[in-house]
């Protein structure tokens, strides 16, 4: 559970995150903000170090030791704009984990939660980054990456399904990716999905 793992949240802040989907009265960005707050509050109780939060579009920014209070500030400082360059941010998060592991500072393992609404601009290199990471791992418990889709973009769903199904067939040593599309969420809110991901 939480006290045995480190958690990193990677949030898409590309321009389309300001869209509002049918059946909701909030933008994707607002929904993600509320859900991140719920997750941070839960983590505040369980892990006093806070969580690591990244925001990415064309470039990315990392925030360490994030508490619920800091989440508010992060979302105030950022507005959705730009593209979806997922490779650089994912590479940084994975590198951080391996650096901590090497220094003996990693807990039992790391879970990276990626919240995105579109297919990344760099689909192929996202696969490569994840496959490379699995080659440095000794067991599949060390690192888990969950991709969670917000919105209903069909190409995003297709990309996530490919990540979930094809990694090992194209060279990954372990299947470390789990994906949750909008359909998988059914009646769960994004906050509930995030909380269930850390309870696994």
Language model features with spans:
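Acidic, low-complexity intrinsically disordered regions
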Residues: 1-200
């Amino acid at each position: 559970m939480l006290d045995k793992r480190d958690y990193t949240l990677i949030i898409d802040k590309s321009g389309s995150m300001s869209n509002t989907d049918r059946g909701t009265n909030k933008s994707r960005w607002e929904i993600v903000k509320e859900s991140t707050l719920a997750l941070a509050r839960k983590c505040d109780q369980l892990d006093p170090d806070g969580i690591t939060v990244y925001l990415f579009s064309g470039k990315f920014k990392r925030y360490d030791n994030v508490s619920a209070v800091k989440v508010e500030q992060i979302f105030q400082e950022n507005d959705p704009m730009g593209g979806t360059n997922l490779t650089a941010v994912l590479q940084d998060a994975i590198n951080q984990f391996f650096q901590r592991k090497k220094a003996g500072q990693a807990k039992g393992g790391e879970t990276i939660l990626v919240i995105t609404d579109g297919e990344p601009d760099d689909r192929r290199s996202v696969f490569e980054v994840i496959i490379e990471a699995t080659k440095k791992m000794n067991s599949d418990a060390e690192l888990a990456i969950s991709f969670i889709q917000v919105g209903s973009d069909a190409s995003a769903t297709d990309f996530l399904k490919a990540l979930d199904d094809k990694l090992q067939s194209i060279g990954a040593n372990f299947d470390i990716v789990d994906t949750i599309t909008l359909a998988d969420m059914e009646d769960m809110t994004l906050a509930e999905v995030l909380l269930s991901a850390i309870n696994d």
